[in-house]
Amino acid sequence: MPDFLFPNIPMPERQSKPRKRGLTMMIDWGLPLGLQKDCLEAQGLYVDEAKIAASIPRVMPKTYLKKKIDTYKADGIFAFPGGLFTELAIAQGNYELFLKDAKEAGFSGIEVSDNLLKIDPRKKKAAISKAVKEFGLTVMGEVGRKEGSMTKEELIADVENCLDAGASMVLLEAHELFHGDIRQEVLDELTKKIPLERIMFELPVVVLPDVTKAYKVKVLFWMIKQFGTDVNLANVEWDEIYFTEITRIGACGTTSHSQGAYRLAGIESSEE
């Protein structure tokens, strides 16, 4: 860990990298390499995973993509392409070729989702298993739809299916849980059955219609209050890393985190 100024202002401690919990996944919309390097020099200690989003790996020059992946890996960051790109490969019948290319590019793993493509649970399980067993890739399963929604029972069964197939962790699609009202009942039931360290909650992304930065921050505050500092969070933009970190430790202008810095300093919760 680096040295920090203000050593006389105590803060709640966090696990250092490589972390097993409290992971932060940064979403990369084609961040230029120079900015990526500056970003990681400043705040890479708070980034555990990086998703190069959507189908961006297909339109980025090969040598540049490899440099970006290598830069992440050099900082101990797990880099993988977005699940929508995987869905496109499956729909085209090019999944095995996609896995070969992902391996050749240097990605540590992939994401297997069914946001748009309706995949039979057995086929989804087979896709995850193939990537893990035949290609040695770490798989992030993803559960949830970008259009419509799943029942509580369907969502939990899908998470279990991904983990049974060999996924190291399951991402929960933000649209499924946080589009409009937060689906508290679904989250309560899910976290009773699945260990929190095997789940990563996506924050809403502001590139989607009707999603505002204010709403994303509201969801972030709620997640930390509900599940604590060590909840796994995805879809954090490069300029939100520090903000997310100080929110995790309850030092970001809200007293909602019972074990956060403000509350531990004796400041009463404004919600009580």
Task: Locate the predicted segments by residue.
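Generic structural signal for hydrophobic
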Residues: 39-43, 72, 101-105, 131-132, ...
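Hydrophobic faces of well-ordered beta-strands that scaffold small-molecule active sites
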Residues: 21-28, 47-52, 79-83, 110-112, ...
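Active-site mouth loops of central-metabolism enzymes
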Residues: 19-34, 54-57, 80-94, 140-155, ...
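Conserved N-terminal beta1-alpha1 strand-loop-helix module at the mouth
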Residues: 1-67
